[in-house]
Swiss-Prot record:
<keyword id="KW-0378">Hydrolase</keyword>
<feature type="binding site">
    <location>
        <begin position="19"/>
        <end position="26"/>
    </location>
    <ligand>
        <name>GTP</name>
    </ligand>
</feature>
<keyword id="KW-0479">Metal-binding</keyword>
<keyword id="KW-0342">GTP-binding</keyword>
<dbReference type="Pfam" id="PF00009">
    <property type="entry name" value="GTP_EFTU"/>
</dbReference>
<keyword id="KW-0547">Nucleotide-binding</keyword>
<dbReference type="Pfam" id="PF03143">
    <property type="entry name" value="GTP_EFTU_D3"/>
</dbReference>
<dbReference type="GO" id="GO:0003746">
    <property type="term" value="F:translation elongation factor activity"/>
</dbReference>
<feature type="domain" description="tr-type G">
    <location>
        <begin position="10"/>
        <end position="204"/>
    </location>
</feature>
<feature type="region of interest" description="G5">
    <location>
        <begin position="174"/>
        <end position="176"/>
    </location>
</feature>
<dbReference type="InterPro" id="IPR050055">
    <property type="entry name" value="EF-Tu_GTPase"/>
</dbReference>
<comment type="similarity">
    <text>Belongs to the TRAFAC class translation factor GTPase superfamily. Classic translation factor GTPase family. EF-Tu/EF-1A subfamily.</text>
</comment>
<feature type="region of interest" description="G3">
    <location>
        <begin position="81"/>
        <end position="84"/>
    </location>
</feature>
<dbReference type="InterPro" id="IPR041709">
    <property type="entry name" value="EF-Tu_GTP-bd"/>
</dbReference>
<dbReference type="InterPro" id="IPR005225">
    <property type="entry name" value="Small_GTP-bd"/>
</dbReference>
<dbReference type="GO" id="GO:0005737">
    <property type="term" value="C:cytoplasm"/>
</dbReference>
<dbReference type="InterPro" id="IPR033720">
    <property type="entry name" value="EFTU_2"/>
</dbReference>
Amino acid sequence: MAKAKFERSKPHVNIGTIGHVDHGKTTLTAAITTVLAKAGGAEARGYDQIDAAPEERERGITISTAHVEYETETRHYAHVDCPGHADYVKNMITGAAQMDGGILVVSAADGPMPQTREHILLSRQVGVPYIVVFLNKCDMVDDEELLELVEMEVRDLLSEYGFPGDDIPVIKGSALKALQGEADWEAKIIELMAEVDAYIPTPERETDKPFLMPVEDVFSITGRGTVATGRVERGIVKVGDVVEIIGLAEENASTTVTGVEMFRKLLDQAQAGDNIGALLRGVAREDIQRGQVLAKSGSVKAHAKFKAEVFVLSKEEGGRHTPFFANYRPQFYFRTTDVTGIIQLPEGTEMVMPGDNIEMTIELIAPIAIEEGTKFSIREGGRTVGYGVVATIVE
């Protein structure tokens, strides 16, 4: 049979393997590519090729991540696998690897372990919306009742963190046996991917989301009005749209976009990814500033207090050399601006060491346009000392 051409026309989904160390995440990743390669949907990648993940220096932090791609009959997937636990924490908090869904790998021989719990919590905090479970190493467990027990444990754990534990697909297999080409176990990999296809929805495209553009610069054009420039983060903006100016002010201002310009050309509309200048009706030069956002009316609000999942850079990564304590007041960099904020640590936590990851409550001195999942960095005098993601809005 001739190899099917690698089509780009299929919907694209980003997924990743998560779970405890040595439960078989990387072996499963290798097994998926190897099994799908037989149907022409992937390039087979061995365990060693994936395990030797290159270290990526993403914004000064070192993250080891393996990226593989493959396709099923209906979709094209980009799949990330991280060798170390710290790599997951960094990856998920900085959004270096955005996941539309995760495959949670749990060894049937060991059951859920500390990092199983941690990765589920992390997925919840950073907004990985869907999880499918692969119970691995089932060839090592003869007792059917034991398998059912482990499955129940995993489902309970998922429910505990707000995932629909009872409804999540759980596939029992053996990544190693599938990798070695045993047909019965290969079938389990096919079954896993069929569940991933069916259970993890195709993400909404950036252009289908409500319009949002962080303001980078503002200038006035004599006789025309005020122009805000920036890169459209999501959605589409058309001439004539009513938008809100959000953040750094007591209340949102509303205005109409009377012109959209890109590379000095006038456009009817701009979309996610475009760098534009938006001409705003009736807005004075001093009514809008860098750090605010332009957004579709009612789509996003300004908030000052929120809970966040944060990881603090180690000394080696260019971070602080000393711990910080409650009431620490660094700058929080959201999109295009720094805002000072005060940190509250969880009960029982006295201090945070460089290299830690922790949930904290942050109160900014001025409200800013944020939502659950908004990423930020923590800075001191222009130097980045940590990264975070908004987990829940408090007020």
